Amino acid sequence: MSAQPISDFYAYPDAAGHFGKFGGRFVAETLIGPLQELSAAYDQARQDPSFIAEYDKDLKHYVGRPSPIYHAERLSREVGGAQILLKREDLNHTGAHKINNTIGQALLASRMGKTRIIAETGAGQHGVASATVAARLGLECLVYMGATDIERQKINVYRMKLLGATVIPVTSGSATLKDALNEAMRDWVTNVRDTFYIIGTVAGPDPYPRMVRDFNAIVGRESRAQMLEDYGRLPDAISACVGGGSNAIGLFHAFLNDPGVKIYGAEAAGDGIATGRHAASIAAGRPGVLHGNRTYVICDDDGQITETHSISAGLDYPGVGPEHAFLSDSGRAVYQGITDDEAMAAFHLLAHTEGILAALESSHAVAQSIKLARELPKDALVLCNLSGRGDKDVHTIAAREGLAL
């Protein structure tokens, strides 16, 4: 916890990209120049009304925003306690929040004259969203994906290929998201002249954590306005799943200076934090440097990154965005572990009560929201970010339950 209370969370990051003691730019000398170029281009674009207008137009007419807030009445009755509201990011084009960010970064890539984009992906949703905007803008697209994740996300792999992207399997390390990000960074160093790296989460060196946050902040801005319009007040609590944490920071950001809104992040506790088979970086990690920024990481006593586990490919990452680390240390947000079993139970309960198949990532937030609702009075409002749809996870769920499709 910070010794001094934070009076304005919007004062972060500072000019060097730091969120308190987290964030920054810890990279090889060869990347300093490209990152400075990217930072300058982004700072210029975000002040350009024509760029903002083009981005907003795409969000409305291509993505289909605004996404609605849905009152899950049957789920709320089944659970007892507070009313559970769902921010329906699963209804966006491509089926998740990821396209909010890829559209913004792809427009920036075109503005910078880049002709090739690369991306990393875990669950495949960021890869699909990157391939989608690349197709729309006529850009070459390569997506790095861990071989383990390719096996458990075959549908999204094929979707990327249908959209014209090349999917590069990564077999190093644990062959998951961390390793895909490593390979994408190596590609960018080699091909920086014509290549734009669209990072999919609020990690990486500055300016990525703030840039990805800003492009996803539409989720929170919409939610805040919708809550005031539909309910006449802000929610009592908000919840989102956290791997790197892009969907979560997108929701959280609009509420950071509202002390009456409690903020909760759901990390992947896997088989249980005590087992060591999890991906709960804040709950069980320690400060360290990963992928160019200082944050909480899952590592051994020598500081070496250790393997993680989650049923959800998109949460299977040994770090977390530096702003989340900062929010945790400041006490503004609380991060809790949700196990595979809890996420699976929430997936089924939401399907049976509301007819909605949530992504396994999002199901962690649904599980957390259910726990919160049970502790709150009936007139309390819990807003859960349903960050993606679960079509991509049907085979994983069936296999876990011993069914062959």
UniProtKB/Swiss-Prot annotation:
User: What are this entry's molecular-function GO terms?
Assistant: tryptophan synthase activity
Q: Which SUPFAM superfamilies match?
A: Tryptophan synthase beta subunit-like PLP-dependent enzymes
Reactions catalysed according to its record: (1S,2R)-1-C-(indol-3-yl)glycerol 3-phosphate + L-serine = D-glyceraldehyde 3-phosphate + L-tryptophan + H2O
Q: Does the keyword Transcription apply?
A: no
Q: In which pathway does it act?
A: Amino-acid biosynthesis; L-tryptophan biosynthesis; L-tryptophan from chorismate: step 5/5
Q: Does the keyword Lyase apply?
A: yes
EC id: 4.2.1.20
Keyword annotations from UniProtKB, A to Z: Amino-acid biosynthesis, Aromatic amino acid biosynthesis, Lyase, Pyridoxal phosphate, Tryptophan biosynthesis
The family database entries (InterPro entries) matched by this protein are listed as:
Trp_synth_b_CS, Trp_synth_beta, Trp_synth_beta/beta-like, TrpB-like_PALP, TrpB-like_PALP_sf
Q: Which CDD domains match?
A: Trp-synth_B
GO cellular component terms, alphabetically, are:
cytoplasm
Cofactor annotation: pyridoxal 5'-phosphate
Q: Which residues carry this modification: N6-(pyridoxal phosphate)lysine?
A: 98
- Quaternary structure note: Tetramer of two alpha and two beta chains.
Family designation: Belongs to the TrpB family.
What HAMAP family does this protein's entry cite? Trp_synth_beta
Please describe what this protein does.
The beta subunit is responsible for the synthesis of L-tryptophan from indole and L-serine.
Question: Under what name is this protein listed?
Answer: Tryptophan synthase beta chain
What gene is this protein a product of? trpB
